[in-house]
Amino acid sequence: MFDIVIRGGVIHRGDGEAPVEADIAIKDGVIVQIGNDLGPAGRVIDATGQIVTPGFIDIHTHYDGQASWDPELRPSIDHGVTTAVMGNCGVGFAPVREGDRETLIKLMEGVEDIPGTALYEGLTWEWESFPDYLDALEKMPRTIDIAAMVPHDPLRVYVMGERAVFSEPANENDISEMRRLTREALEAGAIGFATGRSDVHKTADGDWTPSSEATRDELTGIARAFAGLDFGVVQAVSDFNLERGEQDFDEEWQIVADYAKASGRPFSFSLMQRDFAPEQWVKLTKLSEELKQEGVDARMQVAPRAIGVFLGFNCTFHPFMGYPSYKTIADLPLAERVAKMKTPEFKAQILSEKTDKVSGPGSSVPPLADLLLEHIELVAEKFFQLGDPPDYEQPPENSLASKARAKGVSIYEMIYDTLLERDGQELIYLPLYNYTELNYDNVLKMMEHPQALYGLSDGGAHVGTVCDASMPTYMITHWTRDRKRGRRLDLPRVIRMLTGAQADYLGMRDRGYIREGMRADLNVIDVAALQLEPPYMKQDLPAGGQRLLQGARGYTATIVAGDVVMEEGQLTGAKPGRLYRAGRAQAIAAE
């Protein structure tokens, strides 16, 4: 008898080919048979009129801290993700000496907007080395699988101490030791190595990240830790010295390219369109094509929508938080704040005021927020009321600036009234990247590039302003069904981007496809009913910290290693997820 049989579903195998209608039998966590009229099972899932897909693989998350205390890893599990890769952008929590723990917390707080108070209370610190960290992660039963890359920042701090924090160049001994520790981590099961070189990434104190100015010798020296290995990937995030000029751009690209070449492994970097350099992404795609022609398996991580932030009264930032009148009520519960703000007297008072600075020492708000406030009338051309259901590709006439002009009110009043809707829980969406032309035509071009990978969800990060772990659901609903402002994508292609293509890049040979003998990581989805819900704030992080979550309707079941972990939007309590150890997993899959 089989453990589970999924009957009558339309199977998307993860290979991008046309789907087929068939049944799937699962036994001992593995897909054992695909066909019709399969034998009896302990449980039958009726998938008639629905699709069955491999479990989604998210290659770009930041659950590095959360994974040590949270077995569920929401919101990723809410959107069909069965494997999440963390350690991206070079930030993480291992290796670490006891005296450097605060440094790494401030780094993660600043770069990825994860509350330091939650990290201080939640992190278990059962490790020093990276292999220790993997062992600690392995102890916890969890809902989905996780895999971890070696992050450059903690590695540099571990080897160089304060010299790393002050961005001193690494010497030969430093590089040799970082290479040795990276190799040690890879042999223990790390799935790769990641570095961060973005000028916008700063610590909570406003300092540069330790790896942001690492030299070519350092990066290529560490990358040679992969010599002789047949597994592992390397990742980088960089803005390629965008604001420093063309010569600096070319030099930065060459450093990153040399790093990729030295590793001999598949390489990916983040690709997005920035308003102040709207054609840079095109140049990067061409350079990536050239790098591939040189023999590097070069990929570009792309997002299926804008990289944006939410503004709201419970979010990390909203436009009125620096106003004197608002500060007098800022600590009140939301309902009391809303009641006060709805009074004509309070509204008139606050709209007569000017804002104070909101960033600076002790503030979780980045300096970018003050820049936005200085130019809010211009920025508001890209302020959109998210709505229910959420709409991430809205036309210019829907912007709050356009609505304010049409209504004959100031942009400040328009923002004020909008944020008070839904009892103060309404969100304003500000697409920062990928929305220069106020549509997703360029996003479509990125997604269709043969070297594109779905990425950049940042699951677990930017918890007070972003909830892009919902992107897998959005890829299906928007790009295959709902888009009205341009061309769509075929469903088999989108499913492949979420599954088989990810597994191929990562070298995960036991998942990503629906085939006999593969691990039974699966989604049963009612595509007609599939719908994103609005993001909402939940106060469930350690130390009372809050984060944005986002649900979805239409996932009938999510299965991990043969166990149903999510059913009709509810966790079942099953925890079959584990730490994926690269190298070891590849060896088992090859047997």
Locations of regions flagged by a protein language model:
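Histidine-rich, glycine-flanked metal-binding segment
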Residues: 2-4, 10-55, 535
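Divalent metal-coordination and catalytic microenvironments
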Residues: 9, 29, 49, 60, ...
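Acidic, glycine-enriched loop/beta-strand segments at the rims
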Residues: 12-23, 427-437, 443, 490-493, ...
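Divalent-metal coordination cores built from histidine and acidic residues
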Residues: 69-192, 228-229
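Active-site neighborhoods of metal-dependent hydrolases
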Residues: 133-137, 143, 149-159, 168-172, ...
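C-terminal cap of metal-dependent C-N hydrolases
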Residues: 367-368, 445-452, 469, 524-570, ...
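Short, well-structured alpha-helical segments that form the helix of a local strand-helix-strand
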Residues: 413-419, 490-499, 514
